[in-house]
């Protein structure tokens, strides 16, 4: 198993993203998942009708994208022989993690946030770095 394989990185990212989508889905129904839910990471979080709809939206968005990363992109990347396209996919993967990483860091630095908010930060920066060192 090549740990610098872009297809493996995308697959692992899709699996982790699916887990986060599940956490947000639970959050939409006011079920707090230990360590990862908004309520667990931000004790001052108050569920409202709007926040539940926003969590549902996030769950569907992340879940949809994770399905592509699990069921399509790994096999597509393994069959892809065009080096320029592979490099472009790698660049996009790394690039879209940068604003996400900054946003997650900002959220973890908010007053009242618990230590476990840094789990999401570590995951986000980890995938950014792993994607950056991937072989394209």
Model-derived segments and their meaning:
Residues 43-47, 80-91:
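Juxtamembrane helix-capping/reentrant segments at transmembrane boundaries
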Residues 68, 86-105, 123-127:
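Hydrophobic alpha-helical membrane segments
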